[in-house]
Amino acid sequence: MFAYLKKKESGIPTEELRITVPKVKTAENSALSLDRTAKLYIGGKQTRPDSGYSLNVVNADGSLAGEIAHGNRKDIRNAVEAAHKACGWQSSTPHLRAQILYFLAENLETRGEEFQNRIMKLTGVSKKQAGHEVETAVRSIFSYAALADKHEGLIHQPPMRGLALALNEPIGVLGLVCSDEAPLLGMLSMLLPAIAMGNTVVLVPSRPFALVATDFYQVLETSDVPSGVINIVSGDAEELCSVL
């Protein structure tokens, strides 16, 4: 009578079923494994090269470090035009330039480990040597920030009656080409005195160490450096210099 209440055998074992789920690679540290082509830095923003091509950069051990944008004649022209448009930097107060350089040094210092690792891989130097270069680079920015508002003019007394004023004025737009030594410090040693005195620059980084310059883009973007003051065009240095 109550047969319908009895538990029917379903034919499926009552033991716990175990389902094997394949392991899926998570996105942890995916940003480090992404292969991206670095852009140029013109007019305060990252831009694609006119040619659409890129160049490989290798580490000291021969492995591929990444790619850099292959700038050409048009990119240099755009960078020079952007530098001329940033003429307000020349008339800015030395105090303002000093404050921006201080901020630049602080932002570079917070990313010191990142630059240290990059220098180690590109040059093959020890961790201590790479760290020393980063520390020296940060101190250099602080030093030029302190000097920015101390480069004052002079008052001369000529042989004739009266006074003569000697004023320090920026040159204007400077073209800078980095050497193949000291990836970070070498670049900043050319860049800092130029912008501290009110000049705008178009910089061509060293091809073997150009990734240090492209990493520097993010430091510039977070340091309130006005658009067009610093323009960086990577590529074949000989080709770019002939245009610059």
Where is each model-derived feature located?
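Short acidic (Asp/Glu) and glycine-rich catalytic loops that position anionic groups and cofactors
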Residues: 56-63, 116-119, 196-197, 223
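Short, surface-exposed helix-loop/turn micro-motifs enriched in polar/charged residues
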Residues: 49, 93-96, 129, 186, ...
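A generic structural motif
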Residues: 53-54, 69-72, 208
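Hydrophobic face of amphipathic alpha-helices that form TPR/SEL1-like repeat modules
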Residues: 2-64
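Alpha-helix N-cap/helix-start motif
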Residues: 50, 76, 112, 130, ...
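Glycine-rich loop-to-alpha-helix module at the N-terminal edge of alpha/beta enzyme cores
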Residues: 61-150
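Rossmann-like NAD(P) dinucleotide-binding subdomain of oxidoreductase/dehydrogenase enzymes
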Residues: 120, 150-244
